[in-house]
From Swiss-Prot:
EC number: 2.1.3.3
Species of the source: Trametes hirsuta (White-rot fungus)
PROSITE patterns xrefs: CARBAMOYLTRANSFERASE
Protein name: Ornithine carbamoyltransferase, mitochondrial
Subunit relationships: Homotrimer.
A Pfam family the protein falls into: OTCace_N
Subcellular localization: Mitochondrion matrix
Record-stated family: Belongs to the aspartate/ornithine carbamoyltransferase superfamily. OTCase family.
């Protein structure tokens, strides 16, 4: 297909329509189903547990990154994002090149515009995990190839996409009639798209700091029909900054957001309870004050019971987790979707790599009603 003359970048889910977001989720699920059999030992399924040397008879997932290189430009430490990106690029036939803080320092040894042009001249996509959001905006401004936000001070789009995929896969937990259909053995290994379970409108409670994950939730969940109830201390540094709130209002999401300083009020009627780290990278010097400010915000069974959460409420955390944020009973208990959510980071990043870096099709046309299977 002919490439767009305008380079597509993705900084936040606020840049996408609900249809485009759903397209990514559907494509993520499709890639997950078609790629997973390739990751299992050959002959394991249906062979009585015995291994086989027979070649795979399954079709490979999309190879849109064949012979292409993706630069992972990470100025912050990473476990899940880096692993997801490197394995996703490999499954798409490409190569991920990791450039850490010690390898390249944006704006220190070389200006950001120069770095963007150099990296973009050698790679076909840039996946950047930066500090201040202005860094990735400048990178995108001068890059000749697509730039995808792996994390910045303001936004974390790939995390929220993984959360949404997890909700769709577990839709039956919220409404038994919404279960995703189980594909047959033949369909599971085909290139045929399987419809995901529809997630009914949920009440989502977020308890904790207003950071990048919450910011992308604020501009996404209300547009997908969910109510968002947020609890954070009454201090401006724990509330959404103006740049984020302006996007919230612009998209009309503020009408479905309730903000309070009382975590019990936030979890009232909650189907899903979400929290995040209270102390992000670079905030270590504030640890003592932050622990004091967030006293009483730990997600526990007692807090959710006293606040009146839905009896079947579920829990998510983007990781890494500290026990101050959520106790072991919830984190490791049957309510937790944490590790399913973590696993889905790989598949949503793989979908973004395929659509944004491989095909330049994510933003080249409106995702409303687009058939992802036609790619």
């Amino acid at each position: 297909m002919a490439l767009s003359t305008k380079v597509p970048h993705l900084m936040t889910l606020a840049d996408l329509t609900p249809g485009q977001i759903q397209r990514i989720i559907t494509h993520s699920y499709h890639l997950k189903r078609t790629a997973q059999p390739w990751l299992a030992p050959q002959g394991r399924a249906g062979s009585g547990g015995k291994y086989s040397n027979a070649p795979h008879k399954l079709r490979m997932p999309s190879q849109s990154l064949f012979s292409k290189s993706i630069a992972l430009l990470f100025s912050k430490r990473s476990t899940r994002t880096r692993l997801s990106a490197e394995t996703a690029a490999l499954l798409l036939g490409g190569q991920a090149l990791f450039l850490g803080r010690e390898d390249i320092q944006l704006g220190v040894n070389e200006t950001v515009p120069d770095s963007a042009r150099v990296i973009g001249g050698m790679c076909q996509g840039i996946f950047a995990r930066v500090g201040d959001h202005s860094e990735i905006e400048e990178l995108a401004r001068y890059s000749p190839v697509p730039v995808l936000n792996a994390l910045s001070s303001l936004w974390h789009p790939t995390q929220v996409l993984a959360d949404i995929l997890t909700l769709h896969e577990h839709a039956a937990l919220f409404d038994p009639a919404s279960a995703s259909p189980t594909p047959s053995a033949a369909d599971a290994f085909s290139q045929k798209y399987t419809k995901l379970g529809e997630v009914r409108p949920l009440t989502v409670a977020y308890v904790g700091d207003s950071a990048n994950v919450l910011h992308d939730m604020l501009v996404t969940y209300p547009r997908l029909g969910h109510q968002l109830r947020v609890a954070s201390p009454e201090n401006d540094k724990y509330r959404a900054p103006k740049a984020v709130w302006d996007r919230v209002v612009e998209l009309g999401c503020d009408k479905n957001i309730f903000w309070t300083a009382d975590p019990r009020a936030a979890v009232k009627g909650a189907d899903l309870v979400v929290t995040d780290t209270w102390i992000s990278m670079g905030q270590e010097a504030e640890k003592a004050q932050r622990l004091k400010d967030f006293a009483g915000y730990q997600v526990t069974e007692a807090l959710c019971r006293e606040g009146g959460a839905n009896p079947d409420w579920k829990f998510m955390h983007c990781l890494p987790r500290k026990q101050d944020e959520v106790d072991d009973e919830v984190f490791y208990g049957p309510r937790s979707l944490v590790f399913q959510e973590s696993d889905n980071r790989k598949w949503t990043i793989m979908a973004l790599f395929d659509l944004l870096f491989g095909k330049w099709s994510l933003l080249a046309r409106n995702g409303e009603g687009a058939d992802a299977g036609s790619e």
